[in-house]
């Protein structure tokens, strides 16, 4: 394949491939398809049915993408019919200039499979140009002595049309002195000349005017005219004579402009003015006059422009030598241009694939191109080659047409595009070459799965993070392009509950950012694992998974919680009893606290914030153990209070406080009075609520009393006097062994008085007797449930009727004397009957109270947890404290039927006055405050 661009180093395989590829190129090796059309054909005119001439059906036109290509595209193919249509204006004179034969070469390209067919369109000339004279006014001179038959040369007209449409004839208007003769030269050109018919007489007529008309051979013919003015001069009988009738010279096309080409010379045997010769171009094409210049005096011809053998191979001109007397003669000059290897080969891409799939098999055609060299002979023979380290190679089809095909596997991820440089070199000396680079883009297929940046991810997230905050980001890459490389992220697995994953975390499908959907709690969830998936959008889709472990870090968000000492169910505080004889270092109690945090945030330390007696107790910094720092002194109070702070090790640290109530006593009996008289801090808001409730209760009680009084009065009127006989002494008294003789059965009128303190505990006032009783009076039964009747006569009942319906004021002091106070078991004075129960009742009552306290503390309903009248006992005092710890309890017991509170012995030691008899009873704590 002489002009092949194939790579010579692979000659062996190509000898095998050539017979296989020959059928593929066979259509391009056949004779070209020829069409002939006239120039100036209208746009859209049909040149011929190209599809039919190629043997293609109408369906193949669009299916195989039939099209034509050329340097200057004057034609197009109808996509429906396959007709070859005129696309642009076709002017033969502009396209082919002075060439006699005008042809346009096209390449018809079809695909599936890819083939090329040669098409030649011959452009026929039409008479679209009229003849034209260079000068509309022609001035000639002739001597009157000129003999008949003397000829005067005229400038010919020019017509760019050829053949029959070129200039056919000349004519002039009739004149007795001149006639027109047409001279035909060797190349068929026609040149007009005037011939003198008879002698001139200058004295008779000094000038002659003629009209010269040039006609072409078109149908209808076109014409042009020029005015000839002939002046008659005196005689000049010797015309100039050239040294040669024809000058011929060969010039290299590389001759620079302005170089001397040829000098013509003529001689005249006349003398004087008649011997002075001037040189002019005659009967020369306008393009030739532009290419050359002629010195009128010397006859030197020079080139004005560079020669180009590929455009014009030969120039022909006529040079006229005219003497001063008007006689002239002509010679012919022929200049031939010699071809030089001055044109580099051209590479013209006729078809190029936009993209090549990276899985394309070897041998796939990706581009079609051709080469052209305007030089002739060996200077115009071209061979092509490309680089050897790329997976492409070149096959030559025919007539300098080539195919660029794949020659190996393609991988877009390694090489997304190839810059293929085609080098064309001619066989001139020296050889010239040119190159053309084309870029081939490799189209992507989804052949790569996403790859994560890390094999696994571990992130640390502090608890209490804001919901919606980003806690991590995973990133995957996919070297594919477009949708094949577009990655979406999702959560596919987790060690959390399947339905709870979305409530804990979410992942952005676009960025891979993992967001927390809620605030994490280290104490509930310390770590969890996710499996994230990166999936591309290719077809089929490819994916990859990665594990993400989230470690929830601890924050100091939980304050220490004190387990001991704890408050009772009703809010009362426990007391710890310390023996009075406790030595320094004695373990009194231990503050127990926990912290839900971990690490340093849960490292607790204990500190004393406030102590009623500083220096009496010590507190373990880490253990929380409360020990005595020294022995109890005589001046130290029996009741001590410690305010302990428990701090954790977080930053900033959190703390909790606990209040320890410590009582120095050797037995429970000593601390019972203190438990009853604990001060209770007052709250202004609670006091306001208390007063409101008391006021409401008083109004209700007054209303109830009014209703009861009205009912009692109505019943009193309706009952007979015999009914009241029951109130006589002894009528209703029941005696028997059940009740000791000190007591009588009866009913006491009572009322409830409810007080609410800020601690939330409720205080119940015991029953209040409506009639004041003396310690030496017995109780008798009355039919009316409203009063207790003293044993007097009937006149007392009638004289004091208000005692039945009203409540007497309480005694100013219900304290017992020292003789009346009960002692230890078995020490009761037998003379004070009717005041205290016997010792058996005393023992059973205390045991029942302690057991009830322990039982109620266990189920959260204790009434002995420190409220009013409960002695401040709690569950922890129940089981371990028995009667042996309480030798005497009666000094702290409220006496039913009295508004006064029996003060304890400590109250007397403090010298406090007894409560007044106004009927308003306060809690012991409030009395101390006021």
Curated annotation (Swiss-Prot):
| InterPro entries (UniProt xref) | Cadherin-like_dom, Cadherin-like_sf, Cadherin_C, Cadherin_CBD, Cadherin_CS, Cadherin_N, Protocadherin/Cadherin-CA
Report residue spans for region: Disordered. 791-839, 900-930
Any one Gene Ontology MF annotation carried by this entry is: calcium ion binding
Q: What are the subcellular locations of this protein?
A: Cell membrane
BP-aspect Gene Ontology terms: cell adhesion; homophilic cell adhesion via plasma membrane adhesion molecules; nervous system development
Where composition is biased (Basic residues), the residues are 920-930
Which GO terms of the cellular component aspect does the record hold? Answer: plasma membrane
UniProt keyword annotation of Glycoprotein present: yes
Q: In this UniProt entry, which residues form the Extracellular topological domain(s)?
A: 31-691
- Keyword annotations from UniProtKB, A to Z: Calcium, Cell adhesion, Cell membrane, Glycoprotein, Membrane, Repeat, Signal, Transmembrane, Transmembrane helix
List all Polar residues biased stretches.
Answer: 800-839
Membrane-spanning segments? 692-712
Q: Where is the Cadherin domain?
A: 31-133, 134-242, 243-347, 348-452, 453-562, 570-675
> What spans does the record annotate as topological domain Cytoplasmic, numbered to this chain?
713-930
SMART domains annotated for this entry? CA
Question: Per the record's keyword annotation, is Disulfide bond included, yes or no?
Answer: no
Glycosylation sites recorded in the entry for this protein? 304, 419, 545
Superkingdom field: Eukaryota
What residue range is the signal peptide?
1-30
Q: Name one Pfam family in it.
A: Cadherin_2
Report the function annotation for this chain: Potential calcium-dependent cell-adhesion protein. May be involved in the establishment and maintenance of specific neuronal connections in the brain.
> What protein is this chain from?
Protocadherin gamma-B6
Which source organism?
Answer: Homo sapiens
Source organism phylogeny: Eukaryota, Metazoa, Chordata, Craniata, Vertebrata
């Amino acid at each position: 394949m002489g002009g092949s661009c194939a790579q010579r180093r692979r000659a062996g395989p190509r000898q095998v491939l050539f017979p296989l590829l020959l059928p593929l190129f066979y259509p391009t090796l056949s004779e070209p398809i020829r069409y002939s059309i006239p120039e100036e054909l209208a746009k859209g005119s049909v040149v011929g049915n190209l599809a039919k001439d190629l043997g293609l059906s109408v369906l193949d036109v669009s299916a195989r993408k039939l099209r034509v290509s050329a340097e200057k595209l004057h034609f197009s193919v109808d996509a429906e019919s396959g007709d070859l249509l005129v696309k642009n204006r076709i002017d033969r004179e502009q396209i082919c200039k002075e060439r006699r034969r005008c042809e346009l070469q096209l390449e018809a390209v079809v695909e599936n499979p890819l083939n090329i067919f040669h098409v030649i369109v011959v452009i026929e000339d039409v008479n679209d140009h009229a003849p034209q004279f260079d000068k509309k006014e022609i001035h000639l001179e002739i001597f009157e002595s000129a003999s008949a038959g003397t000829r005067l040369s005229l400038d010919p007209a020019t017509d760019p049309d050829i053949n029959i449409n070129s200039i056919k004839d000349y004519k002039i208007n009739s004149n007795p002195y001149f006639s027109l003769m047409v001279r035909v030269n060797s190349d068929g050109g026609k040149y007009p000349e005037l011939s003198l018919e008879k002698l001139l007489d200058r004295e008779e007529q000094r000038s002659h005017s003629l009209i010269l008309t040039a006609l072409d051979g078109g149908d209808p013919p076109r014409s042009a005219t020029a005015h000839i003015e002939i002046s008659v001069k005196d005689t000049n009988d010797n015309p100039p004579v050239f040294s040669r009738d024809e000058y011929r010279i060969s010039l290299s096309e590389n001759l620079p402009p302005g170089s001397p080409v040829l000098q013509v010379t003529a001689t005249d045997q006349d003398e004087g003015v008649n011997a002075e010769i001037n040189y002019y171009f005659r009967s020369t094409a306008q393009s030739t006059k532009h290419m050359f210049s002629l010195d009128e005096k010397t006859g030197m011809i020079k080139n004005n422009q560079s020669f180009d053998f590929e455009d014009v191979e030969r120039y022909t001109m006529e040079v006229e030598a005219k003497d001063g007397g008007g006689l002239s003669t002509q010679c012919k000059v022929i200049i031939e241009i010699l071809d030089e290897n001055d044109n580099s080969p051209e590479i013209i891409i006729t078809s190029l694939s936009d993209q090549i799939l990276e899985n394309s098999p070897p041998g796939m055609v990706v581009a079609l191109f051709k080469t052209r060299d305007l030089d002739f002979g060996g200077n115009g023979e071209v061979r092509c080659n490309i680089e050897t380290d790329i997976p492409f190679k070149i096959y030559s089809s025919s007539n300098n047409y080539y195919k660029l095909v794949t020659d190996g596997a393609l991988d877009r991820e390694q090489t997304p595009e190839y810059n293929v440089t085609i080098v064309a070199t001619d066989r001139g000396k020296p050889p010239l070459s040119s190159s053309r680079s084309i870029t081939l883009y490799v189209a992507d297929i989804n052949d790569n799965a996403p790859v994560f940046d890390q094999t696994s991810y571990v992130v640390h997230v502090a608890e209490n993070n804001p919901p919606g905050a980003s806690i991590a980001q995973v990133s995957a890459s996919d070297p594919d392009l477009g949708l094949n490389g577009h990655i979406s992220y999702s959560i596919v697995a987790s060690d959390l509950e399947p339905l709870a994953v979305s409530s804990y975390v979410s992942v952005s499908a676009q960025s891979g950012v993992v967001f927390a959907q809620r605030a994490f709690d280290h104490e509930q969830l310390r770590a969890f694992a996710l499996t994230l998936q990166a999936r591309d959008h290719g077809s089929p889709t490819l994916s990859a998974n990665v594990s993400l472990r989230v470690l929830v870090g601890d924050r100091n968000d939980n304050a220490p919680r004190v387990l001991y000492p704890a408050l009772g169910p009703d809010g009362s505080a426990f007391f710890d009893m310390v023996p009075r004889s406790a030595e320094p270092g004695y373990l009194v109690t231990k503050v127990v606290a926990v912290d839900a945090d971990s690490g340093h945030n849960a490292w607790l330390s204990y500190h004393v914030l406030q102590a009623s007696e500083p220096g009496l107790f010590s507190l373990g910094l880490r253990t929380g153990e409360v020990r005595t720092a020294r022995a109890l002194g005589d001046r130290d109070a029996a009741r001590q209070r410690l305010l302990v702070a428990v701090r954790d090790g977080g930053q900033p640290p959190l703390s909790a406080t606990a209040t320890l109530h410590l009582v120095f006593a050797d037995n429970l009996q000593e601390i019972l009075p203190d438990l009853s008289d604990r001060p209770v801090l007052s709250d202004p808001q609670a006091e306001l609520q208390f007063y409101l409730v008391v006021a409401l209760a008083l109004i209700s009680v007054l209303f109830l009393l009014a209703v009861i009084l009205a009912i009692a009065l109505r019943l009193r009127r309706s009952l007979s006097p015999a009914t009241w006989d029951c109130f006589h002494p002894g009528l209703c008294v029941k005696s028997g062994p059940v009740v000791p003789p000190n007591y009588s059965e009866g009913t006491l009128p009572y009322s409830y008085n409810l007080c609410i303190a800020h601690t939330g505990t409720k205080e119940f006032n015991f029953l209040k007797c409506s009639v004041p009783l003396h310690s030496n009076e017995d109780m008798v039964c009355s039919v009316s449930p409203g009063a207790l009747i003293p044993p007097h006569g009937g006149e007392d009942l009638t004289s004091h009727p208000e005692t039945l319906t009203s409540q007497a004021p309480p005694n100013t002091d219900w304290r017992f004397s020292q003789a009346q106070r009960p002692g230890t078991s078995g020490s009761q004075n037998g003379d004070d009957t009717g005041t205290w129960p016997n010792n058996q009742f005393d023992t059973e009552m205390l045991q029942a109270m302690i057991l009830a306290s322990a039982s109620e503390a266990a189920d959260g309903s204790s009434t002995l947890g420190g409220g009013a009248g409960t002695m401040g006992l709690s569950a922890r005092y129940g089981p371990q404290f028995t009667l042996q710890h309480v030798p005497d309890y009666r000094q702290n017991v409220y006496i039913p039927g009295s508004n006064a509170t029996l003060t304890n012995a400590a109250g007397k030691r403090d010298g406090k006055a007894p409560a007044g008899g106004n009927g308003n009873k306060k809690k012991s704590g409030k009395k101390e405050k006021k």
